[in-house]
């Protein structure tokens, strides 16, 4: 009887590990795909497509994955570029997308707390300057 229980436990553990690996692989695949879509849109000069791609990549957060950090940097660069060009509305869209992406990826911890703090500071500075409400 003990052997049977041990066999069931081993099978349950193996199945759980396989399911977890499949989940992580699927999430990693979608993360890479969304990042690539963001990069392609960025190269085309498509603001909305780039923001959506990078934002979606961050939503697929996997701890210690460098692509999430690259997506965050790209969104930050898009926001800064628009801010320098005087397009406050687009800058706010990008800063808010970056901030909300990390909030959306919250689970046991909130990832990207440094990005959130930086975005909060920029948003607070830019909202009073926004003309289109």
Language model features with spans:
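Hydrophobic membrane-insertion alpha-helices, especially the h-region
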Residues: 8-27
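Internal alpha-helical scaffold/solenoid segments in large eukaryotic proteins
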Residues: 24, 28-35, 52-53, 59-61
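TPR/TPR-like alpha-solenoid helical repeat scaffolds
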Residues: 66-82, 106-132
């Amino acid at each position: 009887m003990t052997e049977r229980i041990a066999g069931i436990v081993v099978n349950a553990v193996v199945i759980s590990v396989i399911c977890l690996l499949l989940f992580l692989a699927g999430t990693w695949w979608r993360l890479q795909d969304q990042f690539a879509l963001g990069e392609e849109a960025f190269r085309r000069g498509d603001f909305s497509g780039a923001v959506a791609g990078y934002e979606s990549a961050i939503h697929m957060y996997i701890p210690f994955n460098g692509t999430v950090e690259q997506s965050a940097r790209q969104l930050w660069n898009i926001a800064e570029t628009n801010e320098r060009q005087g397009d406050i509305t687009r800058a706010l869209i990008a800063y808010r997308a970056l901030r909300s992406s990390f909030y959306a990826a919250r689970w046991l911890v909130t990832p990207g707390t440094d990005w959130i703090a930086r975005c909060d500071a920029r948003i607070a500075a830019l909202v009073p300057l926004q003309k289109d409400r």
